Amino acid sequence: MEEKRYLKRKEKARSDGNRDQVAVSCNQLGDFYNQQGKYTDAVREYVQEAQIYASMGKELETAKAKRMVGEMYTLLCDYDAAKDHINDYLKIAKRLKNQVEEQRAYATLGRVHLLHGQSLADSSASGSMEQLKLAEKNFLRSLLLIKDLSGQISKLEQLDMQARCYLNIGVVKEHMEAFQESIEYIDKAIKISKTHELWDLTHLCYISMSLLYICKKNDATAALRFCNMALEVAKRFPNKVKKICETLITKAEILIKAGDFASAKQILTKAYKKNTPDENDRVNIEKQLRIVVKVCQTLDELVLTSSVDYAKLKGLYEKLGDGCCHLMNYEKALTYYQKMLENAELNQESGKSLVPIYVSLYQTYRDNGQFDKALEYLWKEFELNQDAPSEAFTTLCTIAEICEQQSHPFWTVHDVYQKALRQADKAGSCSDKLVKIAMVRLRRLMLKHNMQVLVENLEADATAKGIDLDQEESVGDDEEESDGGGTAVQQNTPDWDDDFDLATLTDSDASDLDETEKPRPQRTTRGNRTLVIKKNNKGETQLHQACISGNLELVRRLIDQGHTVNVRDHAGWLPLHEACNHGYREIVELLLDKGAASAINDKGGTSCDGITPLFDACSNGFLDVAELLLDRGADATVRTDYNETCIAGLDKWRQGAQLVDGEQAQYAQLRERLLRTLSKVGICSDKNARPLTNFNAKRISREERGSMSEEEDEEEALHESNRRSLSHNRSGSEYGAKKSKSSTQPSASKEYRSVMAHLKRPNRLNDDPPSTSTLNKHKRNAFLSEDEVDADNWLIDDVGPERKRKRINSGDLSRRTSKENFQDTALSLPANWEDDLLQATPENEYSQRQKQMRKLTLSRSSSMSSNHSSSATSSRKKHQATLLDSGFSRFRSESPLGSESSQDGTTSLISVRTIEPDSTTSTIQVLISPAKSSPIKVQATPVLATTVSFKVKIQDELLLVPIERKKLQDINIRWLAEEAGRRYNKLTGLTPLLRLKTADGFAYEETDPVSVALEQNMLMASILDWKISPLSQRYEEMCLQMQKTVDNKVKLLLERSQNNNMLELSGLWMRAEKTEPIFKALLHQARLTVLDLSCNFIGNEGCQQLAKSLPTLLQLKALRLQCNAIGSHGLEALLCGQGMDKLELLEELNLNQNPLGNASVRILSKYCASPAGQALTCLQLAQCELTELQDFDLGFNKLTRFDISFNQLTQQSVRRLTDQLNSCRLEQLNLSYVRWPLDDASGFALSERLVTLFEGGTCERFVGVQLAGCGLNDAHMYNISQHLAKAKQLQMLDISDNSNLSGTTLGYILDELPQLRDLLAVNCTNLLDDIRLQKLEQLKQLPRRLELTVDEQVFSMPGALETLQSIWQLQFGDKAKMLTTSNSRKIGRRYKGLLKLLADGSDAE
């Protein structure tokens, strides 16, 4: 309808001759088609618009229309056309000197290059990188222009442009795999957009960061954190439902990839029930949700299935694997399929029954890019299918396809197809069809490898069988797909998208309990009085507060009066979370009965780190609460956003607890219950197999703490500030429960002990149970009276919600945003009670209190509210606001103040509370009189903290250095730098020499007092040098630390390296466990220039160890890892590890004789393109199982020494290699034995490429050239020798195993290359004949070393070898020697074999 209206307007404008209106109509139609996804139609309209404006001379409008044409072509993936139109747009903008449009043009052009680079990522690595660099260049130009736009556009538009440029550059850096730079740029975009409330852009940045962490860094925790932030921003939009659903889709995908299907189900159900207006998103959500629901149902069934019912377990694991494949979580699918195979074997299944499992495994390994494993299971399937020729044929065709895809040698793939043909001949009725398919594919393979002779033979065979291969080529693929392995896939994969009533999902699946957006149910009671649900400034309702304080009766009354059960505070916590976190089992049970069961697996709001009530209970040691939740249906498989399971939280609590036998048994029983559930669904690892005891919990805790100082404990508390748990003293609670209920007035001794306990642990929960006298004294009404409501703590929020602080972890301190309860008790103590207390307090206890006070000041974990007084007469009236509402919190001060005498001469005691301030206030002490419940009116005096902590950043470590306030003027910056270095040493074992700077880079003098840095939020430390022990001493220290034996031979070599900065550990055949202390000792040995580890067995594991130290060897120029059993995974860990960009001087990389495989080529390309690879000039890859170099660039153009010998390269790879190598720079080149297959055609093609290589440059720098086994002939060698004649420093030439060479070549070499010292021509039997022997006599200069294969039968004259020997001795004197490899001449036979002619016999090997 809308389209017709636009078309009608366009026709009317055209008939009226109004070209302006026609252009406007074209623009409107183009926008309409763009929104509908009809990009071709949009292009047509925008082109018309541009033509009309161009004919009218309106250049700016023409430029804008061309930009839209370019954007449409971009969406159609026609990037070249898009670039043409946007470049036109850019030219017009420049001509008009319109900087705003010029900036937009550069940004648009950068986006086209970015998308083009993404599209080339899988096909052409070099092309992709080129496009990404162009994108970066254009985005940077766009960024530079923004600064010149001041005054032309508003400040907000300018900032929006700047932030978008930073985001775009960040995305480019992500695709260039410069992840750290990408994060830095996106962070800049986030800061600008958040500061200036550009929420749409902020949301986009958070989503980009989330995808970066999950897709590139595989860090689900960070990805979820950014996703949660995006979710908070999405709630600000007018179209928030659409944005929220988009964000929830991303969050669900992250959880699916992490294998947390229960959490993904909650998120997708929430998204489904929001009913996004975007149809594509709605279909995607529904499809994903159906699959996830079925996976969760299968997991539930799996938990209930007997562990010996192998047949049922096999079926369930198969369903789970299929579901994970549909969700594209192939890693998890492989885990389930392996378990399926295990259960099939336990069920005594064998033979054909295993085929579906092998099919599932190979398909999934193939989808996951693990082709070697896929081939392994394909061959197993083939072994079982040999009696079924058609199935065996399909399997072999798949094997050949994968081998061809992985660039396996031609003959390997050829042999597989030959086997397939033999199986096709046995296939009976479908034999002809299968033979056609095999022949078509085999012919395609031969043509790809230029096997013309084989193609002709195959076509002749096909013709003899009545098959026209040209005709069958077009239909071969269709028949293959219809008759191939598709049936097996369909049988193996159930229909996961069949009908399932999503409306049956309950609210418990939705986890969408944000009651603030829904009308609250209000219950009308007698007298039309209703319960008004109020929230304090933390968002806590009366029910939250009652659950925190453990008031069961109040909880029951609030619910009966209509209080919503599932209501969130500002941070996202439910009352159920609070009750579980504080361990009130009766309250938990009541809440579950009254409607909280729907939220039993709730993960809180976006600020709650995905913590469920069950995790709350487990991590705080409330075992009975955890058992209750499990009995009522809590899902133990739900993980937090930090990927922690309930069992991990339980074990973390157990490490800090001492349990008696009964408690230990309860803990072990609960743990076993959780472990049984988690292990069945494949979550728990073997390390969690045994429960902790008091003994090993202490040991583990000691190992984790190690040698941490008090201040490091504070650092740990800050580091864990985003986590939370409630410290709970179990023994104290039990003690409190045993007290006599009738005793309402404690004795003085008990009061004294209570005071001492609070002084020692000011943050500890009150262990005494709340007094029940008041509750028993009065009969409760059905309603809350005005006096029963703690009016001081309730303030109607008319300012807007204050973000509730996240729960934090501070060791033994409370790590919860909920308020702690303290009773303020009037103590009847003597007048000199202060002196007695101070004398009774040991010095170490005082220091312990100081430490805890510092922790409280640092963490400021929560605002802690007071309980009602236990006195029946204490009541408070409602005031407008209280200190607590202003953000203050309370805990007991470390020491009481002195008493004051009353007017009548009696002594009255004043109890003291220190109210912890927020960031804008000082500490306030409030004095409480025993005779009154209200504070005494005294002047509040600020009390400064006794210590000041400086934050210092050293590389990637953040340190806190506390200093007593009174010493600030006596300590200088030098002391602070030394102390920070000492603490860094405790963390890493290395001591740096530091210079401290401000955050913006201004350096302090060493003599400056430390007080000048008080205003700095963080100090940056630059490392001037390292205090490092000699390498051999470091090795001994590492061996001692790791409890390994010191190898004296290694130690001696390490000592030698100190003299020449070259560490040579070649030929020791050490494995990874032996090299680990060596690699740790290498950390920060910055003067080391050469590291030679040739001929060891470090493998991939050793590479991971070395990768930690390698970036710190800043002067390293040569890394030799020849013959170390290193694969592609080890190479990736080594070259793509964090910090490798700092290794900017590495010139030589020797990886010879390692099974790297083709997968390593991408890794090497990435490394060579990085800053660390820019200095690389020597690359050695001999015998590394390489066959296909694809389009990757290993920095060939800048190499001076290159060795890729003994790798069977394809002709296409050789062509690309010779095109990229630079003969102007090369000094050493080894291309021996790289051709494949070994036929005349490939030899000729390789020789032609070699000639092209030498012709492409000056060849002046060559010192050594090795071309053995390259299929060279005389013509090729003539051309090559002509070019090598320019290399005046040429020392060695190896042309061995080129059997087509004749004596003519030897003549060329001796004439053209007189500077040659070594000539190797082994197995070139036709090289030396009578003519060449005479030529040798005439030459004045010969190579000093000549290795030839000689056949005396070639010579017509007798005594050819004697003549040769005399020539040699005449040239080089008595030291010259001729060596043979057999004694045939001594027994009168003619000699045939290797002949070595040496100028100096002492050089003989």
UniProtKB/Swiss-Prot annotation:
Disulfide bonds: none
Keyword match Lyase: no
Residues in LRR repeats: 153-181, 439-465, 1085-1108, 1113-1137, 1143-1166, 1186-1211, 1287-1311, 1333-1357
Record localization: Nucleus, Nucleoplasm; Chromosome
InterPro entries assigned: Ankyrin_rpt, Ankyrin_rpt-contain_sf, Leu-rich_rpt, LRR_dom_sf, MMS22L-TONSL_complex_comp, TPR-like_helical_dom_sf, TPR_rpt
Organism of derivation: Drosophila melanogaster
Annotated segments matching region Disordered: 465-535, 695-753, 806-827, 841-880
Annotated GO biological process: chromatin organization; double-strand break repair via homologous recombination; replication fork processing
SMART domains reported in the protein's UniProt record: ANK (SM00248), LRR_RI (SM00368), TPR (SM00028)
Polar residues composition bias: residue spans: 841-850
Protein name: Tonsoku-like protein
